[in-house]
C-alpha cells in the first residue's frame, strides 16, 4: 500500500512521467502486423524523412500513421517548444486491440468467422 498524502503521491507519479512528445491512436481499424510494416520503416528516422516515407507508402496503415506522426510533431512544437529540425522517431509500436467478430455465409449452410482486428498505435518523438 502506498504511503503519504494523495497529493504527494500524484506529485511523485507526475515527476516520473515521460516528457517526450507522443501521439496515440486507440482502436485503429488495422491489424498489428499490417501497422508494423509501416512502423518498422520509420523507426529511428528524422521526422521529415518519416513523413516522406508514410506519404508515398501505398499501405492503408500509412495514412493512419501519417496523421499520428503529424499530431506528435504538433505536440512537440506546442507543448514542449521543440525544434522540428531536431526531432526523430524515438519509439513507434502497435499493440493488439480488441477483435470484431463477424460471420460470413459459406456454401451448404456453413458459416465462417471473420475477425476484424484492431490495434493501438503509439508514436514517440525525441530531440537529437
Regions found by a protein language model. Give the residues of each.
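Strongly charged
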Residues: 97-128
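Ribosome large-subunit tunnel/peptidyl-transferase-proximal elements
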Residues: 2-94, 118-128
Amino acid at each position: 500500500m502506498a504511503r503519504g498524502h494523495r497529493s504527494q503521491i500524484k506529485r511523485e507519479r507526475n515527476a516520473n512521467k515521460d516528457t517526450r512528445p507522443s501521439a496515440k491512436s486507440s482502436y485503429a481499424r488495422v491489424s498489428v502486423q499490417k501497422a508494423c510494416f509501416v512502423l518498422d520503416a520509420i523507426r529511428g528516422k528524422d521526422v521529415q524523412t518519416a513523413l516522406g516515407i508514410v506519404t508515398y507508402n501505398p499501405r492503408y496503415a500509412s495514412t493512419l500513421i501519417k496523421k499520428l506522426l503529424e499530431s506528435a510533431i504538433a505536440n512537440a512544437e506546442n507543448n514542449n517548444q521543440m525544434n522540428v529540425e531536431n526531432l526523430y522517431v524515438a519509439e513507434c509500436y502497435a499493440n493488439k486491440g480488441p477483435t470484431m467478430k463477424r460471420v460470413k455465409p459459406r456454401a451448404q449452410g456453413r458459416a465462417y468467422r471473420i475477425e476484424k482486428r484492431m490495434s493501438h498505435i503509439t508514436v514517440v518523438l525525441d530531440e537529437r
